[in-house]
C-alpha cells in the first residue's frame, strides 16, 4: 500500500483538515456581528467575543474586500471556533472563541522567506520614472528616497545620474511578493559625485538601523536638510 504520509494542510497555524473551513470576502456593509449571525452564533455570544477582544482587536477594523476564514467544528453541529481576518497578504488576525472562557485575538505573520536582490539603472527622466521603467516597486522608490533624503535633492536629479541598490524582498508561499523588507546598501552617482549608503544596525534590541556613507558618517546627522519626498519629483 501507499505508505507516504499525507502532507498536512497547515494554514494560519491550524491543520485545516481538522475543521470545516469557510472562506469568504468582507462585503460592503458587513460587520463582524452580521457575519457571525449568518454562521449560527447568537447576539450574546457575539457581544461576548467583541467585548473580550476589544483591547487587542477592534472588529470595526474589518475592511470590505478583505478575505476572512471561519473554522468550525467538523461534526454536524459546525460550531464556529475561529475567525481569521487578512488585512493584507502577509498578516492575519485570529479571533479564537473555541473556548468561551478564554476568548482571545492575536496577530500573526504568514511564514515568509527573504530574497536578496540587486538592481541598477541610469536616469533617463525622473528617478521614479526610471525605477518604474525598470519594474521596481514603489515601496523601493520610497525607501530609496528616505535613505538619501538628507543628501540628495531629488528635484535636481538629471539624465545620466545612476544608481545601484541591494535590497531584500519578502515572499510568502515562495512566489508571492509581499513587499520590500529593507535596503542593505545603495549607491548613487549624481552630478559626477558618488554617494554611498550602507545600512548598519545601531541597536539590535530595538532593531533600529541607520545609513552611513563610505567614510562611516551617518547620512542623516551629516545633512540635516529638510527631507524630500516623492510628491515633488
Regions found by a protein language model. Give the residues of each.
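Beta-strand/loop subdomains of soluble extracytoplasmic proteins
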Residues: 229-232
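Intrinsically disordered, low-complexity regulatory tails and linkers that flank structured modules
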Residues: 1-217, 221, 225
Amino acid at each position: 500500500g501507499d505508505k507516504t504520509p499525507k502532507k498536512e494542510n497547515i494554514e494560519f497555524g491550524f491543520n485545516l483538515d481538522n475543521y470545516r473551513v469557510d472562506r469568504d470576502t468582507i462585503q460592503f456593509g458587513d460587520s463582524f456581528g452580521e457575519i457571525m449571525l449568518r454562521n449560527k452564533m447568537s447576539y450574546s455570544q457575539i457581544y461576548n467575543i467583541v467585548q473580550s477582544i476589544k483591547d487587542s482587536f477592534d472588529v470595526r477594523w474589518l475592511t470590505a474586500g478583505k478575505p476572512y476564514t471561519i473554522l468550525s467544528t467538523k461534526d454536524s453541529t459546525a460550531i464556529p471556533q475561529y475567525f481569521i481576518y487578512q488585512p493584507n497578504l502577509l498578516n492575519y488576525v485570529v479571533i479564537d472563541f473555541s473556548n468561551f472562557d478564554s476568548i482571545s485575538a492575536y496577530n500573526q505573520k504568514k511564514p515568509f522567506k527573504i530574497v536578496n536582490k540587486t538592481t541598477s539603472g541610469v536616469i533617463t527622466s525622473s528617478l521614479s520614472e526610471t525605477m518604474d521603467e525598470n519594474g521596481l516597486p514603489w515601496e523601493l522608490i520610497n525607501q530609496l528616497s528616505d535613505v538619501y533624503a538628507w543628501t540628495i535633492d531629488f528635484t535636481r536629479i538629471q539624465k545620466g545620474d545612476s544608481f545601484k541598490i541591494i535590497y531584500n524582498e519578502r515572499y510568502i508561499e515562495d512566489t508571492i511578493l509581499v513587499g520590500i523588507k529593507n535596503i542593505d546598501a545603495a549607491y548613487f552617482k549624481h552630478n559626477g559625485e558618488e554617494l554611498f549608503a550602507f545600512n548598519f544596525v545601531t541597536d539590535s534590541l530595538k532593531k533600529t538601523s541607520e545609513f552611513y556613507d563610505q567614510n562611516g558618517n551617518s547620512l542623516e546627522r551629516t545633512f540635516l536638510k529638510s527631507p524630500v519626498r516623492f510628491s515633488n519629483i
